[in-house]
């Protein structure tokens, strides 16, 4: 992954590839753009849906309809995934660019966003029991054997479609059929926590940690969780360093 700015940088042009239109679910894009501007960068926003190959070059439109050649930027940051039906086509286009220019490169977006990949890798031992399937009966059978489970999409965001499931839920089949209607879903054994910790990593360095206090089974800020100030234990830092080595 590319580096982030820490001072006035020699990299002066960055484009944020994002979805135009609609109401944003958070202010991440605004915060990021403001910080790069403060560091002396020139900022452009490019619409996911506007990517086109013209005259042998990958291009995209800014909000004013001006078309930019993407390989002329010094840094590229993909913010959000855009429309699902065109995701793979857009990723194939972006993969032709120099990946060292990306803050979050294409391989990371494709292979590391989905949760099953982490479960099957070296970090799987640190996850709760997990079942992944596109077959509703496989997931339903696990729930009906007992225990408390969290059912969710394999690559969802913002706490959408996240459910607590036990064999006493009268609508357990309907929930699982809903989760699998478009493909794969996953069950994870529920782990009781009141404060979840999130660790921020950039450039292979741990740069911060914050907590999320939640009142139900969803710890996403978009679902009502509250960010809190927390400290990291030595054991947690050791685990984060293990994650960093795995990511590299």
Model-derived features with residue positions:
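Ala/Thr-enriched low-complexity intrinsically disordered regions
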Residues: 6-7
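Extreme N-terminal starter segment of soluble prokaryotic enzymes
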Residues: 11-15
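Conserved N-proximal alpha/beta basic substrate-recognition cap immediately N-terminal to
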Residues: 20-132
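Structural motif
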Residues: 75-77, 150, 186
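Short acidic/polar capping segments at secondary-structure boundaries
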Residues: 107-110, 134-138, 154-158, 168-170, ...
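Rossmann-like NAD(P)H-binding beta-loop-alpha module
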Residues: 127-146
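Phosphate-binding site of ATP-dependent enzymes
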Residues: 146-147, 158-247
């Amino acid at each position: 992954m590319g580096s982030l700015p820490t001072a006035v940088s020699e990299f002066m042009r960055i484009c944020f590839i994002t979805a135009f239109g609609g109401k944003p679910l958070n202010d991440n894009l605004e915060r990021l753009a403001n910080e790069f501007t403060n560091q002396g960068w020139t900022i452009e926003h490019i619409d996911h849906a506007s990517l086109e190959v013209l005259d042998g070059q990958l291009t995209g439109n800014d909000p004013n309809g001006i078309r930019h050649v993407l390989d002329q930027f010094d840094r590229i940051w993909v913010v959000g995934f855009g429309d699902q039906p065109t995701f793979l086509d857009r990723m194939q286009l972006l993969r032709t660019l120099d990946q060292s220019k990306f803050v979050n490169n294409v391989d990371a977006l494709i292979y590391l966003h989905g949760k099953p990949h982490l479960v099957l890798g070296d970090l799987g031992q640190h996850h709760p029991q997990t079942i992944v399937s596109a077959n509703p009966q496989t997931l339903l059978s696990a729930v009906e054997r007992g225990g408390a489970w969290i059912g969710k999409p394999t690559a969802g965001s913002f706490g959408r479609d996240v459910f607590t499931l036990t064999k006493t839920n009268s609508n357990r089949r309907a929930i699982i059929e809903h989760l699998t209607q478009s493909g794969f879903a996953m069950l994870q054994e529920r782990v009781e926590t009141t404060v979840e910790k999130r660790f921020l990593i950039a450039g292979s360095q741990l740069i911060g940690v914050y907590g999320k206090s939640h009142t139900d089974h969803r710890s996403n800020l978009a679902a009502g969780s509250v960010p809190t100030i927390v400290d990291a234990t030595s054991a947690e830092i050791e685990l984060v360093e293990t994650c960093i080595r795995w990511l590299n």
